Regions:
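N-terminal and secondary-structure boundary signal
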Residues: 1-310
């Protein structure tokens, strides 16, 4: 890394970190209480990926609440780009590996990980660090680069999207967990839990040609919902996404957000993103469209939120 880029990155990360704990606390202050029952949404700040995952799952009731013994589990991270972890173009490999171990520890029959990548799939899997991390954790990497891996399903709840070819591993799985990285996106404006669904389908060109924001919301109505959404915001690409141009596009914020409510997940993540780079919720149209389709709520005042600082 060039010294100039390093200094720029350090400055950005430092500024963002100063906003993180105070800013996120304010952004997610509604109905934030110490609760005995599982909260609707958890935000963990200040730790390493595995430690933050531990805290989030503990607050939500444990991994056993989401994964049962003997189940086939799919973990769907973002692995779309031939980028190293430091660029925050993909989900943090440490988080993915930790989640694989959690699922296997809960008695999962097998844990499969895949993405329909944008760059060459083998390079994405390798450079992201996810393939190596998953295999070492005991999981299975599945390709997503060929149409033969996808099966057509109906999307009866969709407004624009009425059917789609979805990866067979998801169709065959008992449960799946949605694990996006939080980042800027030129087209969708924000990549998070809802946008991460685009990596489960074969024909993404249809999305881009037929109201991208609506199609993102539509695909999320597919009847097999993730049992949990876990947002990786350990590092975030706050500009020039989805690939990024340099490390100056990245801020290290050491945060994780988890919820079963996908619209609330993206709303909370957007509020967090706004502590670094301003983006109005109206620009991220799929959030409002998802709420209109009754996928969840963007009104965080209605939810119980637990914040944890490590």
């Amino acid at each position: 890394m060039k010294r100039r880029d390093f200094l720029k990155t350090s400055a950005v990360a430092g500024a963002a970190l100063s906003l993180n704990f105070d800013g996120l606390q304010a952004a997610l202050s509604s109905n934030t209480v110490a609760v005995e029952k599982a909260p609707d949404l958890v935000a963990v700040m200040g730790g390493e990926p595995a430690a933050m995952l531990d805290k989030a799952l503990e607050a939500l009731g444990g991994i056993g609440k989401f994964v049962k013994k003997g189940q086939k589990v799919v973990i769907k991270p973002n692995i779309g780009w031939d980028r190293a972890p430091e660029m925050a173009g993909n989900t943090n490999p440490e988080l993915v590996a930790a989640l694989v171990k959690k699922c296997l520890g809960a008695g999962a029959q097998k844990v499969t990980v895949f993405d329909h990548t944008c760059d060459n799939w083998q390079k994405c899997y390798e450079t992201s660090g996810i393939s190596d991390a998953v295999k070492k954790a005991g999981g299975i990497m599945m390709p997503g680069n060929d149409e033969k891996y996808y099966k057509e399903v109906a999307i009866p709840g969709g407004v624009t999207l009425k059917n789609a070819k979805i990866h067979e591993s998801l169709i065959e799985a008992d449960v799946w967990i949605n694990v996006p990285v939080l980042k800027n996106h030129g087209g969708a404006k924000l990549t998070c839990a809802m946008k991460n669904y685009m990596g489960i389908v074969w024909d993404r060109r249809y999305f881009h040609s037929n109201d991208l924001q609506q199609c993102i919301a539509d695909i999320c109505t597919w009847n097999k919902k993730p049992v949990l959404n876990i947002v990786d915001a350990y590092r975030i690409m706050h500009k020039n996404g989805p690939q990024g141009k340099s490390l100056s596009d990245v801020a290290q914020l050491k945060t994780l957000i988890a919820s079963t409510n996908i619209v609330a997940t993206d709303t909370a993540a957007l509020r967090f993103f706004n502590q670094v780079e301003k983006l109005d919720i109206s620009a991220v149209g799929h959030i409002g469209k998802g709420e209109a389709l009754k996928l969840g709520t963007s009104n965080l005042d209605k939810l119980t939120i637990k914040r944890i600082k490590i």
